[in-house]
Amino acid sequence: MLKSKSKIFLYIFTLAIFSIVGNTIFNPFAHSFSSDETSLFLSFVDEIKVQEKLIKKFLSENDYDKAQKHLSRISQLYSDEIRDELSERNERIANEITDTISVIDDKIIQKTAKDEITNSIDNLDAILEESVSVRLEAAALTNSTVHALHFAQLVNSLDSNYKHSFTIPNFLRSNETSKAMHDSANSQHKESLKINEPTVSNNKTISDFISYETAKGLISVIKVIYNSTVKQDVTETDSLELDKMDDALNRLGLVVDSKLPYTEIAKLIHGIIHPKIS
């Protein structure tokens, strides 16, 4: 089994509860810095970087409206709580992030030349990198517990964004998640889930494309974090479990790319990923 397995499961289970309880208000950082400040800050930076890439993508397609909406996600992620916490370490950087977001906003509204907007986004990215070095101790970046929490927070964000892609009513989300978890538990003797089987959800149409594009962007980040950190703590005897985790993460990408119903993500996250690291 994975090292620190009980810790990883506890952290991911806790974040999953946060996701269920917090469905009524979409705020990925409603619990910012409440449990492990280091891992949450790393997740915050990763999520902003996802939005930066999406802004560039839509600018290249001349879709300033979607670029603006993804910038709004950055503003949402950079909450007052995170800003205040960062200000305690370095007020200049905290202010520069705020100012740069505002500059990008103005340029998108005015439909400034794409290269100029891209340069401002690159500037924001550089400031974020500096914020990591200022905010975190070097030892934290090699801490296995931090890695596990970092991975867990990003999985939680993927879960949340994919839910909101379909805007399923809260009571249906709860029922469908429970049903998906029950179905997964009953099929654990099978080595994998058939993600194309009929699902309890009739809502198969994406209605929130900003959340959907965010979920897509998070998939690649989650895989990178898993392969570069969490996976490195696994012993040779855990190779079979690694294969199952690799398969589950690949299936996450297939579900999102295929725009399958949210219950399919629930099956993978709550039915495979959580149990495999418990």
Language-model region placement:
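N-terminal secretory signal peptides that target proteins for export/translocation
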Residues: 1-5
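Sec-dependent N-terminal signal peptides of Gram-positive bacterial secreted proteins and lipoproteins
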Residues: 6-29
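Mature extracytoplasmic or organellar-lumen-exposed domains after removal of signal/transit peptides
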Residues: 30-278
